[in-house]
Every structure is written in C-alpha cells, then in structure tokens.
Amino acid sequence: MKVEISKDLEDLIPGYLDGIRKTIQDFKDYLSTEDWENLRIHGHRMKGSGGGYGFHFLTEKGKQIEDAAKESDGASIQSAITELDDYLNSVEIEFVESEDW
C-alpha cells in the first residue's frame, strides 16, 4: 500500500511509526490480559493521530480497536492487530510537496 505524506512531516514519520509499532505491541499485551480499558484508550489515540500524519488506515484500525474494546470483542481486536502488522510491513511512503498533499 502506498501513502502520500507531506514532505513537511518527513523528519517526524520514523519516530511516529516507531511509536505505532510500540502501540501495536501494547495492544497485543493488553489483549492477552483482556485489558479493555487500555485497548479503548490507545485505540482512540491511534484513531486521532493517524489521519493527522496521512495514515488514514491507522485511523480506521484505531477506531475498530476502540469500538471493539467497548464490547470486549477480542476477535475483532486481534483482526485489527494482524492488519496493522501487515500494513506496517508493506506500507510504502512517498513524500510530496505540501501543496500536493
């Protein structure tokens, strides 16, 4: 999957994605202990941050995790985690001039 990101954010993206990778590991840990509240909180944070950096898929998956945590739906959360892992392993980032973004 290819994502276009503003060149203005180029220096921030590696750190942001490292944080997302840590969040995904946290999701796995929270799911293993059925910590629905932390899953909800961190899903909400991912939902809020993804689009701001141009990663709308992260926003969608954050919302899925947040909503599923409210229902204690571990299967849906596990599915989202798997999709997030796959996404981060395959996403291609193209940095574009701000007026194009």
Where are these regions (language model features)?
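Amphipathic, coiled-coil-like alpha-helical segments
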Residues: 2-3, 7-24, 49, 53-60, ...
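Extended, amphipathic alpha-helices with heptad-repeat/coiled-coil or helix-bundle character
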Residues: 23-71
